[in-house]
Swiss-Prot record:
Record InterPro entries: DNA-binding_RecF (IPR001238), DNA-binding_RecF_CS (IPR018078), P-loop_NTPase (IPR027417), RecF/RecN/SMC_N (IPR003395), RecF_2 (IPR042174)
Biological process annotations from GO: DNA replication; DNA synthesis involved in DNA repair; double-strand break repair; SOS response
Entry GO CC: cytoplasm
Keyword field: ATP-binding, Cytoplasm, DNA damage, DNA repair, DNA replication, DNA-binding, Nucleotide-binding, SOS response
Family: Belongs to the RecF family.
Originating species: Pseudomonas fluorescens (strain SBW25)
Protein name, UniProt field: DNA replication and repair protein RecF
Its biological purpose: The RecF protein is involved in DNA metabolism; it is required for DNA replication and normal SOS inducibility. RecF binds preferentially to single-stranded, linear DNA. It also seems to bind ATP.
Gene3D superfamilies named in the record: P-loop containing nucleotide triphosphate hydrolases (3.40.50.300), RecF/RecN/SMC, N-terminal domain (1.20.1050.90)
Residues the record lists as binding ATP: G30, A31, N32, G33, S34, G35, K36, T37
Presence of the UniProt keyword DNA-binding in the record: yes
Length: 367
């Protein structure tokens, strides 16, 4: 799948624009502050209904504008196309349109337009809180396991109910037991989906990483959020008093984590920023392979400032892996000459110059 047309209005410093990207490689180049990253942010908004640059919406909406909007036409892997649109206003409200109809949730966008982001903050996947790694894991499971979303919603409902009565004691014993049973059932299913996903991801990740970096001894493991030797029901019973004291459930899938270690150490404590970036690239490219296998389609990759922290050898290796995915890629850089030799002659590559918020398509960089 790929975006064949993108229209952006009132996103940061971008002038209203409609452009037609290449179905393969798109390089957006220009000076710092020209608006290159804002183009990626607009596409990210279209696919996930949120920004990757700010948790707050207001900075995304152009000054003195009431809302920002992004529209896109997606060429589907199975043929045909789908039209997507999103508008977000200053009050935080958003409207999603899919093929002319109102949609209820951002998950519907994500299903049609699976996006992968690689940017200078990618190291947070290794260094950041477990929540970031759970989001990475669950993004992957969502795109390969059709039952995941419904089970996830059951889990969240049961968890909210349990946490509410832990804080307020509003449920009788029978209701408490019923919600605990539902929580345990949904938790076991989520754990099963996650374990199956990690089992499929690990060999693809290891192979991908070996083409980017020689890191003997790097291991990827999964912690499910409670003792692997015990049933969750037993863990919840044991920790009930403590859960009541702090007002929330300590054990369960909401505490899961991915652990990357190099020997006896956390990988984030040992690796340089450049090495961390390559590890994250390998993880995200591996996810792309699994999406392709499960959906007979491809992710779309948003790569912000690709040359950052990578030498020429590693830039070329990363470009080669992205090219082998045969997917659509949007890459930003200051100097497109740094990426000139990264692609096969037959691969379509489109150049877009971004200057003061205006986007101009130039030419295939080999012309």
């Amino acid at each position: 799948m790929s975006l064949s047309r993108v229209s952006v209005t009132a996103v940061r410093n971008l002038h209203p624009v409609t452009f037609s990207p290449s179905p393969r490689i798109n390089i957006l180049h220009g000076a710092n502050g020209s608006g290159k990253t804002s183009v990626l942010e607009a596409i990210h908004l279209l696919g996930l209904a949120r920004s990757f640059r700010s948790a707050r919406l207001l900075p995304v909406i152009q000054y003195e504008q009431l809302a920002c909007t992004v529209f896109g036409q997606v060429e589907l892997a199975e043929g045909g196309h789908s039209s997507l649109g999103i508008s977000r206003d200053r009050g935080g409200e958003f409207q999603i349109r899919i093929d002319g109809q109102n949609a209820r949730s951002a998950a519907q966008l994500a299903e049609i337009l699976p996006l992968q982001l690689i940017n200078p903050d990618s190291f947070r996947l290794l260094e950041g809180a477990p929540k970031i790694r759970r989001q990475f894991l669950d993004w992957g499971v969502f795109h390969v396991e059709p039952r995941f979303m419904a089970t996830w919603q059951r889990l969240q409902k049961a968890l909210r109910q349990r946490n509410s009565w832990l804080r307020h004691g509003t449920l009788d014993a029978a209701s408490q037991a019923a919600w605990d049973r539902e929580l345990c059932l949904a938790s076991d299913e989520i754990d099963e989906y996650r374990r199956a996903y990690i089992k499929a991801l690990k060999p693809v990740f290891e192979q991908t990483l070996s083409e980017l970096l020689d890191l003997e001894g790097l291991t990827l493991s999964y912690y499910r959020g409670w003792d692997k030797e015990r049933e969750l029901s037993a863990v919840l019973a044991t920790s009930l008093q403590r859960d009541q004291q702090i007002g929330h459930t300590q054990a369960g899938p909401q505490r899961a984590d991915l652990r990357l270690r190099l020997g006896a150490h956390n990988a984030a404590d040992i690796l340089s920023r450049g090495q961390q970036k390559l590890v994250v690239c390998a993880l995200r490219i591996a996810q792309g392979h699994l999406v392709s296998q499960a959906r007979r389609g491809q992710c779309i990759y948003l790569v912000d400032d690709l040359p950052s922290e990578l030498d020429e050898q590693h830039r070329r290796a990363l470009c080669r892996l992205l090219e082998e995915l045969r997917c659509q890629v949007f890459i930003t850089c200051v100097d497109h000459e740094l990426l000139r030799e990264g692609w096969q002659t037959e691969t379509p590559v489109a150049l877009f110059h971004v200057e003061q918020g205006r986007i101009t398509q130039t030419h295939d960089h080999r012309e």
